[in-house]
From Swiss-Prot:
This is Rhomboid protease GlpG. The gene is glpG. InterPro entries: GlpG_N_sf, Peptidase_S54_GlpG_N, Peptidase_S54_rhomboid_dom, Rhomboid-like_sf, Rhomboid_protease_GlpG. It comes from Pectobacterium atrosepticum (strain SCRI 1043 / ATCC BAA-672). Pfam families: Rhomboid, Rhomboid_N. PANTHER family: RHOMBOID PROTEASE GLPG (PTHR43066:SF26), RHOMBOID-RELATED PROTEIN (PTHR43066). One of its GO terms (cellular component) is plasma membrane.
Length: 276
């Protein structure tokens, strides 16, 4: 038997043990002070465990690990563990880009409350006629939010989806998805309603499409989104077209972002699912 790692959070350690059990690998978890040590019985499986552990440590709160605990019926570690604050949980799941966008978006929202929407939009709104060479505008409109509910809803989804993408695929991949979807969704919305709009929702819908389809095409991968959540997202999108919610919604941005995410996920998984 060989010691694999010691984790300070036994609940996360149990999640990894349960996940590896679904991969036909048995790990033994032993309490050691305030930590949980993981031991491997079959040393021939060490490389497989180390590879899975590396991915797990990038995104330990990914829903697939919780699903593994439900599948194996093991949710109680039997070990006393320290509690983590909301801030620690937030940082644990998110990478630097995820957190940076959240901080900047919140700062822009506060500035809008202090100086007024118009003054901030003068600098950050999608480019109007004659402003096309102000290149930041093609992306900065995603930072604009017009109500507390608007910003909370978008940042929650950005963290929930963008964090795992950055942890698993890297900051570069999340940056590409964010920039491409902001550009395309902004253009689509401006074509339909002019330049007076803002919000991260086009990027969020791109992440929804990307994570969901990637999980469907790579069931054994490390990114997934429950179909029930995807169904909710689609219902929300449809509701926006019927004005059921009683608020102004950037429907074109949502649709464009979703299409961008689906296309990027299809492209990224095409060679894996269709080997030559």
């Amino acid at each position: 038997m060989i010691r694999v790692i010691a984790l300070s959070n036994p609940r996360l350690a149990q999640a990894f043990v349960d996940y590896m059990r679904t991969q036909q690998v048995h790990l033994d978890m032993r309490p050691q002070g305030h930590e949980a040590e993981l031991w491997l019985e079959d040393e021939t499986q060490l490389s497989k465990v180390q590879e899975a552990l590396e991915i797990f440590l990038r995104d330990p709160t990914n829903p697939r690990y919780l699903a593994a605990s439900w599948q194996t019926g093991s949710m109680d570690t039997g070990i006393q563990y320290q509690r983590y604050s909301y801030l620690q949980t937030l940082k644990q799941k998110a990478g630097p880009l995820t957190l940076s966008v959240m901080v900047v978006t919140i700062a822009v929202f506060i500035l809008m409350q202090i100086s007024g929407y118009e003054s901030v939009m003068t600098w950050l709104a999608f480019p109007a006629e004659g402003q096309q060479l102000q290149l930041w505008r093609w992306f900065s409109h995603a930072l604009l939010h017009f109500s507390l509910l608007h910003i909370l809803f978008n940042l929650m989804w950005w963290w929930y989806l963008g964090g795992p993408v950055e942890k698993v695929l890297g900051t570069g991949k999340l940056l590409v998805i964010a920039l491409v979807s902001a550009l395309v969704s902004g253009w689509a919305q401006s074509w339909c309603s002019g330049t007076y709009f803002g919000g991260l929702s086009g990027v969020v819908y791109a992440l929804m499409g990307y994570v969901w389809l990637r999980g469907e095409r790579e069931p054994d991968g490390y990114l997934s989104m429950p179909r029930s959540l995807m169904a909710f997202a689609l219902l929300w999108l449809v509701a926006g077209y019927f004005d059921i919610l009683g608020m102004s919604i950037a429907n074109a941005a949502h649709v464009a972002g979703l299409i961008v995410g689906l296309l990027m996920a299809f492209w990224d998984t095409y060679n894996k699912t269709n080997p030559r």
